[in-house]
């Protein structure tokens, strides 16, 4: 038995290692840990996060399709759920999104633009928009800004089916 909770497992692009968040029983401390996929042996801890009340890892890390030495992850380390960029040495490279709003989820990547597609309530607390952020931190809303949006990406991430509605718009689907 263990006093740890394991969650958000992700494979490395080369499939030789796996990454997971290990939480203490109180769920106030979490560590991103790398393991050898064949032996199950712990290789190293990349970083740790702490919250006095509750640490909630929301999603596994996601490696950049154009650079397998870097990954993104969601964290509330600044008080809001945002996207962070790190490398496989555990170094935090950049906070990609910032502000008094929440990133709901990472939808995928636009490989040619080297950007992340995500959903957030940046425009309004009562909206959910589809947004993009580049590795330089520059971000923008995709498509119609009003309403509640969900998205389906093409394989390349260059095209998006934007499903949305609002109090004045019945369900609509746009190609962006």
Report each predicted region and the residues it spans.
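Peripheral, non-catalytic segments that deliver or gate enzyme domains
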Residues: 1-176
């Amino acid at each position: 038995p263990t006093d740890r909770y394991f969650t958000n497992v992700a494979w490395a692009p080369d499939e030789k290692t796996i990454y997971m968040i290990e939480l203490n029983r109180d769920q106030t401390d979490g560590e991103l840990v790398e393991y050898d996929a064949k032996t199950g042996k712990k290789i190293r801890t990349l970083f740790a996060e702490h919250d006095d009340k509750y640490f909630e890892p929301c999603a596994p890390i996601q490696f950049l399709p154009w650079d397998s030495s870097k990954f993104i992850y969601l964290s509330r380390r600044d008080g809001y759920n945002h996207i962070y960029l790190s490398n496989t040495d555990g170094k935090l490279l950049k906070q990609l999104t910032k502000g008094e709003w929440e990133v709901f989820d990472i939808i995928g990547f636009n490989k040619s633009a080297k950007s992340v597609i995500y959903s957030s309530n940046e425009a309004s607390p009562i909206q959910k928009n589809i947004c993009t952020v580049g590795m330089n931190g520059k971000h923008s809303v995709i498509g119609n800004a009003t309403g509640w949006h969900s998205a389906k990406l093409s394989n390349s991430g260059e095209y998006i089916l934007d499903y949305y509605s609002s109090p004045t718009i019945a369900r609509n689907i746009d190609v962006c």
